[in-house]
Amino acid sequence: MRILGLDPGSRITGVGIIEGERLIHAEGLVLGSGPLPARLGQIFERLQVIIETHKPTIAAVETVFMSRNAQSAIKLGQARGAAICAAVAAGLEIHEYAPRAIKQALVGRGGAAKEQVQHMVRILLKVDRDLGEDASDALAVALCHHHIAQTNRRLPPGVTLR
């Protein structure tokens, strides 16, 4: 199972692709500071190219966290929409995970610090270089889905974690 992890953002969108616990691709799509509709178009178009190149079979996306700034939350929701549309247009099944669930799956604590999650991503994928915050976050989402899918395969029929 090749998993596309997405950490959408209106300035930088994190992208990570894994197969099992093997790193296939990781990058932060820097979208610049142009008008929001142009940046949303970039997310869609650049993800289409990445999906076509690396052929993931499933997409895992971080859900929106509540922000005190309504405008930021709206922009984040729009970036998520562009990313999800690119994945759906490519025929990928979408799975969504809350930030606390991702931290729980990787670190064992839903309240883990971002640095702890990034450290676990590097350990699990056996990577000794800095992947960048956005790519690392996307890989964390992909690893979360991988771990949950593995666990669900071991459970009796009809029983799942989610």
Q: Where would I find each of the regions flagged by the language model?
A:
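Phosphate- and other anionic-substrate recognition elements at nucleic-acid/protein interfaces
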Residues: 1-162
